[in-house]
C-alpha cells in the first residue's frame, strides 16, 4: 500500500508524518487528535491553497481523495475560533504553488482602495501589474522600498534559496525535483504562491501576511520564526496586490508605510477593515466556479481544479478567463 507524506500544522507546531494513502478520514482525525491534542469533534481541517475547510461528514472518505504527497493541512480548534471571520489568522505552507500557469488576461481594477480612517493613516491597496508576476511585484513593493520592478529578480532569488538547500526543498515538498522547480520558478509565465511566500519570508526575515478577500482570512508566513516585522499583501483569487498605511488620504506612494511591528494591532485592524470593504464590494474571483478556456486547444473548463487537471494530462498551460455572452 502506498504512503504519502503530509505536514500537520496547528497551535502546537508543525509535524511531518507519513500515512497510508487509503487511510479513512476518521482514522486521520484520530491521528490529528493524538498529534495536536485537539478533539476529533472540535477539529476544523483546512487544506489546499488558499486553505478551505474539509467536509468532515463522510467519515469513511479515503484521504487520497483530497490529500496528495507533500500537502499541508492546518488544524484549528472550532471551540476557540472567533466568530469574526476577519480575526482568524492561519498559516499554510502548501508548497506546491500553482504548477500550471494561467495567462493573466483578467484585469485588476486600476485604482487604489482605501479604508476610511484618519487617525494614524489609511490602509491602502496598491495595485501591481496584472501579469504572472504580481505576487513578486507586491512583495517587492512592501519589502524593496516600493520598487515593483525588483519583483522580477525575486524569482532568481527563490531559485538560489531552493538550490542551496536540497534537503529541505526536496521533491516531496516541491512537487517536482529541486532542479526542475528552480527552472520552473524562473519562467515568468508561472505564478507564485504559498511556497514562494514562505521562502521570501525566510530570506527577508519578516512575516508576510496575505489576506484572502473571499474568506477574509489572513495567512501569515514566518509567524513561527519569531520575526519582529510584518508586511501585508491582498489576494483576490487570481491576483496579488500590496497593502500599506498611507499617511494622507489618497496620498502618493511616497507617503506609504509598508513595514510594521508584529505587535502593531492598530495597523492590523485597519487592514482588516479594508479587507471587509473589498469583500462586501465583491472584489474577488471564485476560482472554483469561474470559467476558463485553454488557448492551446480551445477547451472550456470550470474552475482552477479542472484547469490544473487539463494541464497535467495535456501539457497545455495557457489559460484565460472565459465569459459566456
From Swiss-Prot:
UniProt region (His-loop), positions on chain: 235-239
Swiss-Prot/TrEMBL catalytic activity: Thiol-dependent hydrolysis of ester, thioester, amide, peptide and isopeptide bonds formed by the C-terminal Gly of ubiquitin (a 76-residue protein attached to proteins as an intracellular targeting signal)
Cited InterPro entries: OTU1_Ubl, OTU_dom, Papain-like_cys_pep_sf, Ubiquitin-like_domsf
GO molecular function annotations of the record: cysteine-type deubiquitinase activity; zinc ion binding
Zinc finger (C2H2-type): 292-316
Domain OTU: 123-246
Location of region: S2 site: 265-270
Biological processes annotated in GO: endoplasmic reticulum unfolded protein response; ERAD pathway; protein deubiquitination; sorocarp development
Positions bound to substrate: 238
Gene Ontology, cellular component aspect: cytoplasm
Record keywords, A-Z: Cytoplasm, Hydrolase, Metal-binding, Protease, Thiol protease, Ubl conjugation pathway, Zinc, Zinc-finger
UBX-like: region residues: 7-86
Keyword Acetylation: no
Protein name: Ubiquitin thioesterase OTU1
Organism from which the protein derives: Dictyostelium discoideum (Social amoeba)
Gene: yod1
